[in-house]
Amino acid sequence: IDSNILTKENFSQYTGKTEGNHWDFTRFNPKHFQHIEKCILKLQKLGIEADIIVMHPYDRWGFSNMTKEQDDFYWKYVIARFSAFRNVWWSLANEYDLLRKKNVEDWERYAKMICLKDPYNHLRSIHNCQLFYDYKRPWVTHCSIQRQELYQTAEYTDKWRMEFGKPIVLDEICYEGNIPFSWGNITGEEMVRRFWEAICRGGYPGHGETYINLNDKLWWSHGGKLLGESWKRFGFLIDILQETPGLGLAPYEKRLDYVCAVPEEEWRNEVKSYYLMYFSFMQPLSREFYFDDETEFEIEVIDTWNMTIEKQGIKKGCRTVLLQDCRKTVSL
């Protein structure tokens, strides 16, 4: 069947054909784009960037199979409308490698259009499913990465920073939820762990939630009320990050039982002004630290789940930090 008679009951029989749509690819529906603009403005008032996904493969209308001329017509219109908003990022596609009728030449053509026609030079990237795009391309401002393994993604953040030399946005490290798909049923505790792991490796993780509820709607695609636990901990995390010196964190030396982040601009300094050590799923009762004999550090032990900060005073030289519980992060 085509999408003209698609319903909830027969969705699994959908063949991808679009003959029943009779879609007019020569005219735009202004009300549709006006609605998107209203959403962008609402996000702007909340201080949120709108990462505009311009194309995606989950298509029952035929938009992913348009001709080159139809594609270009669409892209020019979208760029002309949305580039005027200051809180817009460009995501060329969600899971670009599943759009089987598009090739690298197509994606590079779209990127060139954005670079030429967006006078405000908004941030640009492209999101993968299984295959990475070439993030070293000059038009790519940051890497937009989906998880690569069942158990690890955040753990590769520092490796990707070195490989691509650009900010690493982990916009799909799985979702907290309970759906019967591996990408959407991790616990809130695991989501929080992945966030801290990514940040202490110099990355920028993104949150999503896929709990099945009585309305049979997922927050991930419909919005509404969040049902999980991880989102409650991210405001606490943001508050800590806003207090760190400098404009961002970079990964520093890693030990067997923790990862460490320091201010990006201090990375080459012998002794930094700030260290953030994350113990992930490790739970030592105490840990000894030493940098030099002169520099004084204020020690704070952060409980990333219970959202508490325990101050352990100002010390220098060799110092022992008491942890006594799991989910601990040390701030010096």
Protein language model features and the residues they cover:
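Hydrophobic anchor at the start of a short beta-strand
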Residues: 50, 168, 299
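Aromatic- and carboxylate-lined catalytic core of secreted/periplasmic carbohydrate-active enzymes
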Residues: 176-179, 191-313, 322-332
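Short, flexible, glycine/charge-rich loop motifs used to bind or transfer phosphoryl groups or to couple energy/partner
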Residues: 78-81, 130-136, 157-159, 188, ...
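Active-site mouth of glycoside hydrolases
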Residues: 1-153, 163
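Short coil/turn segments at the loop-to-beta-strand junctions that recur within blades
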Residues: 317-318
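Short, flexible/disordered intra-domain loops and linkers
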Residues: 64, 100-105, 179-188, 218-222
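Catalytic-core region of carbohydrate-active enzymes that cleave or remodel glycosidic bonds
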Residues: 119-121, 137-216
